[in-house]
Regions:
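Residue-level signal for the membrane-embedded core of alpha-helical transmembrane segments
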Residues: 22-29, 114, 123, 149-153, ...
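Cytoplasmic-entry segments and transmembrane alpha-helices of multi-pass inner-membrane transporters
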Residues: 1-30, 52, 57, 62-66, ...
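Glycine-rich helix-loop "coupling/hinge" segments at transmembrane-helix boundaries
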Residues: 116-146, 150-151, 171
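Membrane-embedded alpha-helices of multi-pass transport/permease systems
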Residues: 46-50, 54-76, 106-107, 114-118, ...
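Alpha-helical membrane-interface segments at transmembrane helix boundaries
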Residues: 12-19, 99, 103, 107, ...
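C-terminal transmembrane helix and the adjacent membrane-cytosol boundary/short C-terminal tail
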Residues: 146-173
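Transmembrane alpha-helices
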Residues: 86-119
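Short helix-to-coil transition segments within interhelical loops
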Residues: 68-74, 78-98, 138
């Protein structure tokens, strides 16, 4: 790597693996006291931002690491051997080469965030999840349930199609 820090890498890797191993609904409930401390409440869309962000971070961090690891190290060595510095490597090789994979990771993360935000509705996070639970499930209103499911499917399909199109336009395969 450019600036190897094996101890920090091992520590961050362990934290990321722990974060990825927790089911989101468990994390959501476990973070209630922390959310109350940070935001002052555990209800509403503002409160939902805390667990949704903490839940998505390890997933996106691992996708980013994998995207950057895919870049051919020969290109990095070539830039360094021609007198380039770390910034040249980052902006002339790492980011341009990893961009399609990074965008695919961003697309996956956005899709996951849609699901996470819906799950946050279960504990009062608002949004479509709250609508589905309160007005669909608890009131036995199948039309509301199916309507929210259709909206969620449409949102995910739209994000995925746009992300795939963007990745295809930037990939140099």
């Amino acid at each position: 790597g450019l600036a190897p820090m094996p101890k920090l890498n091992a520590l961050l890797g362990a934290v990321i693996n722990i974060g990825r191993s927790l089911p989101f609904i468990v994390l959501l409930i476990a973070l209630i006291p922390f959310t109350r401390l940070i935001v002052g409440t555990t209800l509403g869309s503002t409160a939902a931002i805390v667990p949704v962000t903490i839940g998505a971070f390890p997933f996106f961090a691992r996708l980013t690491e994998n995207a950057l690891d895919e870049v051919d190290y020969g290109r990095i060595e070539a830039i360094l051997s021609m007198g380039g510095n770390v910034w040249h490597v980052i902006f002339k090789s790492l980011l341009p080469e990893a961009l399609p994979t990074l965008l695919a990771g961003i697309t996956l993360t956005i899709v996951m965030l849609i699901g996470f935000s819906s799950m946050a509705g279960v504990i009062g996070g608002g949004g479509l999840g709250d609508l589905a639970i309160r007005y669909g499930y608890q009131r036995f209103n199948n039309e509301v349930m199916f309507g929210t499911v259709l909206i969620l499917v449409a949102m995910v399909q739209g994000v995925q199609m746009a992300g795939d199109r963007l990745v295809r336009s930037l990939a140099h395969r």
